[in-house]
């Protein structure tokens, strides 16, 4: 499989602290990769590098054959990278439908004059967006909540809605930042099935940061391990589980 995303010695420093050090990471088209490590290992920082929240102080990041150097987050999203966050970031007072529609509007082809004029093209585009929003909501069993405020959904459904919003950006690569956080055992099982379904249904690559090792080991084809910003392992789940460096990093924790 060819590489969709490549980090080549990607490094970021904050003052005298090196948060991520010379990270080499590749994700192939259609691959599901886990990124794990103890608290403070640099996982979310790596996500922020990939999505343009931070700019690397060294190395480079290449996506779909083109450098992401100095790209703003919204441009990176338009290029095909979408993400979720550790803390759910929905519009709580907007309906489920409008939360997803807002993302589709980022890709609206018409300019401001086109929208103000509200001609046939505008209305056709709006109807197309509404249809696509409902298609996504139905796929993820959220259609029945279309007119419900996002804040009224259960925690698990809010997580699901956040993932739907990310998919509305039509990404080639989906970054999931601790999607199982705060979920009970039943919700985690459902999440695992959902992530595998997304990969198969939408034929996209997924990079998953997650502390729950059962989730990671159960669905990831390959796992990359960070410790203090340094990559200490990269391999199949069974290889990573048996790696002495990984065992030492997770000393006292269940693998």
Question: PLM features: residue spans?
Answer:
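Glycine-rich phosphate-binding loops of nucleotide-dependent enzymes
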Residues: 2-255
């Amino acid at each position: 499989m060819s590489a969709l995303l490549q980090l080549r010695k990607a490094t970021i420093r904050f003052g005298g602290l090196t948060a991520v050090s010379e990270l080499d990471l590749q994700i192939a088209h259609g691959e599901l990769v886990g990124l794990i490590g103890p608290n403070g290992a640099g996982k979310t920082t790596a996500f922020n590098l990939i999505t343009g929240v931070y700019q690397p102080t060294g190395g480079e990041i290449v996506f779909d054959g083109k450098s992401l150097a100095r790209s703003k987050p919204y441009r990176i999203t338009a290029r095909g990278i979408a993400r979720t966050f550790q803390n759910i970031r929905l519009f709580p007072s907007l309906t489920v439908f409008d939360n997803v529609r807002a993302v589709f509007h980022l890709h609206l082809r018409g300019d401001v004059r086109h929208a103000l004029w509200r001609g046939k093209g505008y209305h056709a585009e709006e109807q197309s967006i509404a249809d696509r929003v409902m298609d996504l909501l139905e796929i993820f069993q959220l259609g029945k909540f279309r007119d419900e405020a996002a804040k009224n959904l259960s925690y698990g459904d809010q997580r699901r809605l956040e993932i739907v919003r990310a998919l509305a950006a039509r990404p080639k690569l989906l970054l999931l930042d601790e999607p199982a956080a705060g979920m009970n055992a039943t919700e985690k099982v459902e999440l695992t099935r959902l992530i595998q379904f997304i990969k198969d249904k939408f034929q996209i690559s997924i990079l998953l940061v997650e502390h729950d090792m059962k989730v990671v080991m159960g669905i990831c084809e390959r796992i990359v391990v960070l410790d203090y910003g340094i990559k200490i392992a990269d391999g199949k789940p069974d290889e990573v589980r048996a790696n002495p460096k990984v065992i030492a990093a997770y000393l006292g924790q269940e693998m």
